[in-house]
């Protein structure tokens, strides 16, 4: 099973004072035992040339999808105990939201992925809870 569920995704958008937010989320996340994945890690990618609404232009959108696919592939390859449950785009940033069982196995593949994409500014924000 992949760390990124293939089915049951929906998206919506909303506006804030800082511009629009586009959200994609796994609709079955409410069926997951939260005790198995008690930590949240947000992988942040700064867009190089965001459009006027803070989202990617078409060429960069494909690059972001490819980056996401590569990260998921690395996490799958390492059998990392995590699930990707959300994706947000806002203000020139793409966030990939993971629920994580343990940061120890999560950090090495993410670090490798960050090294592979050194031409992009990336960061990881870790915190407890959902």
What are these regions (language model features)?
Residues 95:
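Beta-strand-rich binding-surface signature
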Residues 104-119:
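Helical (often loop-to-helix) elements that flank the catalytic cores of nucleotide-handling enzymes
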Residues 115-130:
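Conserved short beta-strand edge segments in small beta-sheet-based binding/regulatory domains
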């Amino acid at each position: 099973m992949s760390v990124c569920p293939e089915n049951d995704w929906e998206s919506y958008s909303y506006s804030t004072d800082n511009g629009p937010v586009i959200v994609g989320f796994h609709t079955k996340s409410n069926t997951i035992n939260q005790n198995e994945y008690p930590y949240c890690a947000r992988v942040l990618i700064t867009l190089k040339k965001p459009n006027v609404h803070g989202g990617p232009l078409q060429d960069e959108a494909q690059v972001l999808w490819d980056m996401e696919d590569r990260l998921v592939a690395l996490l799958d390859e390492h059998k990392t105990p995590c699930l990707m449950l959300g994706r947000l785009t806002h203000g020139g940033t793409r966030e990939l939201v993971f629920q994580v069982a343990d940061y120890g196995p999560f950090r090495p593949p993410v670090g490798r992925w960050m090294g592979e994409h050194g031409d992009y500014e990336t960061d990881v924000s870790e915190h407890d809870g959902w």
